[in-house]
């Protein structure tokens, strides 16, 4: 099986979309605490997706562009659309800050739900297309080692803060087996401090029974 550079990060992004959509659905827009929480979640989502699109444009798509420029142009145009949907959500956040009327806030909640569904639906289709079309082009023109090298460029471009956010959502979106294999790979190939930070993040993010299973499997492999 060929290496799928989108697999883990897209699982993280889908988990973000699913959980934020559920939070938004149950938010009372006249409850300030609930609104502050969901607006923080939405802000994180659009920030992460904007950064993800930047990385794809500058590292992944650029590797394909020399061979298939028209395909890359089409995907870059999809990223333009994605940024427009992000901007709409950011605009609604700014509108909310100026509202004092309960009825207006309730109406804005409906606008938020529609805008987020549009954002979610677009990105679900977009990511599936990347996993099909872009992956197949990467596999045609590059070896797995070369694809991993591209991925390392993306990783090296991350701040510690953005890495922490992506790790959190990868852990929430991956299966136990996938997490175990990921931790084993990091332990083999990365500095010890990186493994330690990922392990501590797993301890924080995984439910007790899931984390115990992960630890047990790591101990068996030790």
Predicted regions and their residues:
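Small-residue-biased structural context
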Residues: 1-222
């Amino acid at each position: 099986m060929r290496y799928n550079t989108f697999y883990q990060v897209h699982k993280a992004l889908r988990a973000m979309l699913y959980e934020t959509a559920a939070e938004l659905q149950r938010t009372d827009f006249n409850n300030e605490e609930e609104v502050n929480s969901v607006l923080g979640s939405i802000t994180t989502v659009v920030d992460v997706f904007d950064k993800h699109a930047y990385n794809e444009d500058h590292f992944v798509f650029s590797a394909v562009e020399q061979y298939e420029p028209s395909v890359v142009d089409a995907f870059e145009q999809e990223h333009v659309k994605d940024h427009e949907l992000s901007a709409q959500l950011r605009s609604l956040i700014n509108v909310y800050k100026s509202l004092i009327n309960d009825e207006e806030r309730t109406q804005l909640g409906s606008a938020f739900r529609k805008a987020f569904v549009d954002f979610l639906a677009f990105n679900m289709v977009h990511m599936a297309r990347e996993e099909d079309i872009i992956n197949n082009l990467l596999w045609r023109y590059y070896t797995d080692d070369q694809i991993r090298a591209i991925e390392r460029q993306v990783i090296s471009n991350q701040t510690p803060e953005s890495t922490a956010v992506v790790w959190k959502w990868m852990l929430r979106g991956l299966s136990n087996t996938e997490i175990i294999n990921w931790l084993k790979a990091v332990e083999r190939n990365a500095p010890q401090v990186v493994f330690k930070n990922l392990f501590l993040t797993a301890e924080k993010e995984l439910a007790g029974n899931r984390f115990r299973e992960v630890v047990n499997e790591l101990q068996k492999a030790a």
